[in-house]
Every structure is written in structure tokens, then in C-alpha cells.
A protein has these predicted regions:
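N-terminal Rossmann-like NAD(P)+-binding domain of SDR-like oxidoreductases, especially those catalyzing
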Residues: 1-101, 145, 219, 223
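Short beta-strand->alpha-helix junction loop in the catalytic core
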Residues: 103-105
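Short secondary-structure boundary/capping segments
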Residues: 10, 56, 120-121, 157-158
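Hydrophobic alpha-helix immediately C-terminal to the catalytic Tyr-X-X-X-Lys motif of short-chain
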Residues: 77, 81, 85, 115, ...
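C-terminal substrate-binding subdomain of Rossmann-fold SDR/epimerase-dehydratase oxidoreductases
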Residues: 123-236
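A generic structural signal for well-ordered alpha-helical segments
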Residues: 34, 86, 122-123, 184
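Conserved catalytic loops of nucleotide-sugar-dependent glycosyltransferases that act on lipid-linked
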Residues: 108-115
Length: 236
């Protein structure tokens, strides 16, 4: 399982060479090592960022990628390397395009953290959260346990292994404002968010078509957003 990466779109925009070294060269290094060691299969954590701001929804795996950041471009390059290593060297490969993964133990103070963990960290600190943009941008959040399910299925399935690309999500979208209201409802917070200019490379709307992964891997998301948020904000 190749899960390591520079995962911040904003950092990739500021440091494209670092992104290239980690997300492109790093993936190539993993594939080379797997080939040398006789590893049968490599499963890559790719990203929905490869779709870019194409307004068509939901995002399907056969859509033309339109990367808007070095991060997205690096993930797309990794997918192509997987296909090449499968076809040229016989290494079985699968790329999973993660949408917005969330779950307990994400560090809300980290620059690499997702919006949910940052919101929760703000609530705990009594600090007004910052929303980049108008808050109407949408995301398709998927709980980490469902991502684990997808990875295990991708590693074990005989239906994949030739560089296939599969979306990993719930197939439901929610705006950041709706997300904030959901967290307020769970925690009782009275904080009001502040708004800043949208960041370069950020995606406006995101929603996955998960029919392919359901058909090919029998993937079925088990955990809804309410459950996941409850797991994050629960004491301890």
C-alpha cells in the first residue's frame, strides 16, 4: 500500500519541486522497489484532485483529468506510472482516487489537515474557524474505515490489477457551510466562521460516482457523515 505523500494542495503550489520529488519520484521509487523485490501488487492512494474544476458532476473515472495544482498533477503522474509498471513489468497495480477522507486522530493544527479536523480543532479551542471562499463549495467526505475497506478489497480482488483507477467516496456531497452547521449541532458551538479568499488550486465542487468500485470490488460505504463526525468529537 503506497499511502505516503505530500498531501497539501497549497504547499504543492508553493513548492512544486518538493511535490515532484515526493509525489512523482516517490511513487516511482516505490514501484521500482516493488518490482525489484518481487512484490505482486501495489495499491496507490491517488486523489480526486486529478479531476480539477470540471463542472460535470458526479466525477467518473473515465472523465478527462484536468489537474489544477502540482499536487493533482503528481497524483495523475503516479496513476500513469502504475499503468506502465503493470503493462511493462507485470507488477499488478490499482489506483484509488480518494475524495475527502476524514476520521479520528487527524491533527487539526497541521497544514496538511483536512477541513473537518480543522473545524473540530477550532471548536475545541473556542476559535472562530476560517473558511476559504464563500463556503458553498462542496465536498464528498468518506470515513477512514470505508477507505480501509476499499484498500483491502483492491489488494485482494482478482478483478483488478492492471492499473485500474477507482473512486473512493460515499457518493454524497455537502457544502462547507452545511458541514459547519452539522458540527455546531453536534457540539453546541456558537462560533461564527470568518471568510477569506479562496486558495489557488482549491476545487469548487466535488462529488463521486462510485458505481465502478461498487461493481468491480463490491465496495459499499458503511459509515455516514453523522457517524464519522460523532467519532471525531467524542471525548477521548
Amino acid at each position: 500500500f503506497h499511502e505516503a505523500a505530500l498531501v497539501s494542495v497549497a504547499v504543492s503550489v508553493e513548492q512544486p519541486e518538493e511535490n515532484d520529488a515526493i509525489n512523482i519520484r516517490g511513487t516511482l521509487n516505490v514501484l521500482q522497489a516493488a518490482r525489484a523485490a518481487g512484490v505482486k501488487r501495489v495499491v496507490l492512494a491517488s486523489s480526486a484532485a486529478v479531476y480539477g474544476n470540471n463542472p460535470a458532476l458526479p466525477k467518473r473515472e473515465d472523465m478527462l483529468p484536468e489537474p489544477e495544482s502540482p499536487y493533482a498533477l503528481g497524483k495523475l503522474a503516479g496513476e500513469h506510472y502504475l499503468k506502465l509498471f503493470s503493462h511493462l513489468y507485470g507488477v499488478e497495480t490499482v489506483a484509488l482516487r480518494y475524495f475527502n477522507v476524514f476520521g479520528p486522530r487527524q491533527d487539526g493544527k497541521s497544514m496538511y489537515s483536512g477541513v473537518i479536523s480543522r473545524f473540530v480543532d477550532d471548536i475545541r479551542a473556542g476559535r472562530a474557524p476560517t473558511i476559504f471562499g464563500d463556503g458553498n463549495q462542496t465536498r464528498d467526505f468518506v470515513f477512514v474505515k470505508d477507505v480501509v475497506q476499499a484498500n483491502v478489497l483492491a489488494m485482494r480482488s482478482q478483478e483488478v490489477g492492471n492499473g485500474e483507477v477507482l473512486n473512493v467516496a460515499r457518493g454524497q456531497q455537502i457544502s462547507l457551510l452545511q458541514l459547519w452547521e452539522a458540527l455546531r449541532g453536534i457540539t453546541g458551538s456558537k462560533l461564527v466562521p470568518s471568510f477569506r479568499e479562496a486558495r489557488p488550486g482549491d476545487i469548487r465542487h466535488s462529488l463521486a460516482d462510485i458505481s465502478k468500485i461498487r461493481k468491480v470490488l463490491c465496495y459499499q460505504p458503511q459509515f455516514d457523515l453523522e457517524y464519522g463526525l460523532g467519532q471525531i468529537v467524542a471525548p477521548g
